[in-house]
Amino acid sequence: MVIAIFGESCTGKSTLAEDLKEALKAQVYTGKDFLRLAKSEAQARSAFQALLSQAAEGQETVIYVISEPEHLELLPRNCLRVLVTAPLEEICRRFAQRTGGKLPDPVRAMLERRHGCFDDEPCDLHLVSGQTSPEDNCAAVLALCRGK
């Protein structure tokens, strides 16, 4: 099984992935981790797509955490797609925490430009960070996994 957890930065994707990793004994890939699979990017993309396709058809569980829209094209059709979003102010607050407490204006402008970039993507489950607990989010994904 392949579980794609996608959304903007600082929405809770990694927290969810870590919770699911424990529950499902899954392998987690984040962003461009797949580049380690081969020497060239094209070969790495191809190898990663093959890995995902094999996992989608087999017993192994792979979780792919995506924060760049162009990485969605790597996903196999039959994967579980989980969109994680958060209000812009929450994203900015979390990003500021990661950068020492202050959010530079250019970073805020970048976050504002990118906000909503995943909103129209098809998904099996849409989680809004802060509306439910991380434990409830994990339970919702696990329930979908049992249904697949």
Residues covered by each model-derived region:
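Loop/turn-to-beta-strand initiation segments
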Residues: 57-63
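Conserved phosphate-donor/acceptor-positioning beta-strand/loop module used by diverse small-molecule
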Residues: 77-96
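Hydrophobic anchor at the beta1->P-loop junction of P-loop NTPases
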Residues: 5
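Conserved glycine(s) of the Walker
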Residues: 12
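Walker A (P-loop) ATP-phosphate-binding motif of ABC ATPase nucleotide-binding domains
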Residues: 2
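Small-molecule kinase domains that catalyze NTP-dependent phosphoryl transfer to phosphate-bearing small molecules
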Residues: 100-148
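The conserved Walker
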Residues: 9
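Conserved substrate/cofactor phosphate-moiety recognition/catalytic segment
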Residues: 15-57
